């Protein structure tokens, strides 16, 4: 597994199951991250390492089904509800997007490891691109590179996002961007998830801000 060299395919399946179990518990108000994220992740995988691969797959299927049923029962207010997650409190809608993001990227990892094709359909790619773009302000803030007051325009295919230079900022729609990043949606999504290196975007404007985005972009942490 190139993206997670210490894990087998079965380990990735166990990781995805643990993530869905935690997401379900969080929406029920019964989960909070204790300690470091890496330690929690490693412990979740290690807890299932003695199980046959088939049992881990069945566990993931059950966890994913329970999580989907929970989401299917939500009304509009439920989707807006705030829950605990690995980097703080987020909306249930955002948590759903994060779980899809995690499952898609690890699914692609497993497909590559087993020599199979894995592609994103248009609706999924749109959601993944939206999540990846919207992580820019929080990534800048959490990693000490915030640029309060800056305006960033991201163009990914037919979609575009006007973003602030720090978490919580919402630029005026009429504001002139300090930085414009333009990229192929899939290339941007893979870069944000740490599956590729290099910067797959064209840059217009503030080069130092572009470097800060490149150093802090992450849709998976």
Task: Give the role of each language-model region.
Residues 16, 20-27, 71, 196, ...:
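Short amphipathic alpha-helical segments enriched in hydrophobics
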Residues 2-39, 85-142, 188:
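Short, contiguous alpha-helical
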Residues 41-58, 134-149, 216-221:
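Charged/polar, low-hydrophobicity segments characteristic of intrinsically disordered regions
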Residues 34, 79-87, 169-172:
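Conserved catalytic-core motifs characterized by acidic clusters
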Residues 5, 155-159, 204:
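Short strand-coil-strand connectors
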Residues 21-73, 77-81, 118, 123-124:
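Short, helix-capping/interhelical loops that line the mouth of catalytic, cofactor-
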Residues 115-175:
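Hydrophobic protein-protein interaction segments
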Residues 174-221:
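C-terminal interaction segments
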């Amino acid at each position: 597994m190139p993206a997670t060299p210490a894990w087998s395919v079965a380990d990735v399946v166990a990781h995805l199951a643990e993530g869905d179990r935690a997401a379900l518990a969080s929406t029920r108000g019964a989960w909070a991250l204790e300690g470091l994220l890496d330690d929690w992740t490693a412990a979740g995988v290690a807890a299932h390492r003695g199980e046959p691969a088939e049992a881990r797959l069945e566990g993931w299927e059950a966890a994913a089904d329970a999580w989907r049923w929970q989401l299917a029962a939500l009304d509009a207010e439920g989707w807006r509800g705030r829950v605990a997650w690995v980097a703080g409190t987020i909306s249930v809608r955002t948590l759903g997007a994060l779980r899809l993001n995690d499952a898609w990227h690890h699914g692609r990892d497993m497909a590559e490891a087993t020599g199979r094709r894995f592609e994103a359909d248009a609706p999924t790619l749109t959601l993944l691109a939206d999540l990846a773009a919207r992580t820019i302000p929080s990534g800048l803030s959490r990693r000490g590179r915030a640029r309060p007051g800056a305006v960033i325009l991201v163009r990914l295919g037919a979609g575009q996002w006007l973003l602030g230079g720090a978490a919580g900022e919402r630029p005026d729609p009429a504001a002139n961007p300090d930085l414009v990043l333009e990229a192929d949606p899939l290339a941007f999504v893979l870069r944000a998830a740490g599956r590729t290196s290099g910067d797959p975007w064209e840059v217009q404007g503030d080069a130092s801000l572009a470097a800060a985005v490149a150093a802090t972009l992450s849709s998976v942490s």
